[in-house]
């Protein structure tokens, strides 16, 4: 709502993903409001995987789990890792996504991952040495 101020912080991480890298279907932490991914390179020809996959949860009467079973989801879109591609989405309880397993690539998948994250949620803590708010961000949490 526009009547309540919420403080957010931009958190980002440069990462690489080797052969064998994948992420199961999941949704991000509730503290992340807007999530983005920027692909920095293309993967070699002849390999497979590395796509960001977006899903819809099929069970209408159930609460959506943070890591639903694949058989309970339908693939909406698959986005290949191409240089300069920016993917962004509002994070919510139904923002389900995965990364398909990378196989037979001779190079790494380079990308920036980030989010606008609400302060005061699980990604934050108060540093006892100086009393200032610090953040802890890790793409693989």
Residue ranges of model-derived segments:
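Catalytic and substrate-binding regions of extracellular carbohydrate-active enzymes
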Residues: 138
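Catalytic core of non-heme Fe(II) oxygenases with the double-stranded beta-helix
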Residues: 1-130, 134-135
């Amino acid at each position: 709502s526009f009547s309540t101020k919420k403080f957010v912080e931009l958190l980002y991480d440069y990462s690489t993903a080797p052969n064998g890298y994948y992420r199961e279907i999941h949704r991000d932490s509730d503290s992340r409001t807007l999530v983005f991914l920027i692909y920095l390179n293309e993967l070699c020809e002849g390999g497979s995987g590395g796509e960001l996959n977006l899903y819809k949860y099929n069970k209408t009467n159930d609460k959506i789990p943070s890591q639903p079973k694949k058989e309970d989801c339908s693939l909406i879109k698959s986005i290949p890792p191409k240089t300069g591609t920016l993917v962004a989405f509002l994070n919510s309880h139904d923002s389900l996504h995965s990364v398909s397993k990378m196989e037979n690539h001779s190079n790494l998948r380079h990308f920036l991952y980030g989010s606008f994250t609400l302060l005061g949620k699980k990604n934050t803590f108060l540093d006892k040495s100086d009393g200032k708010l610090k953040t802890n961000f890790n793409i693989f949490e």
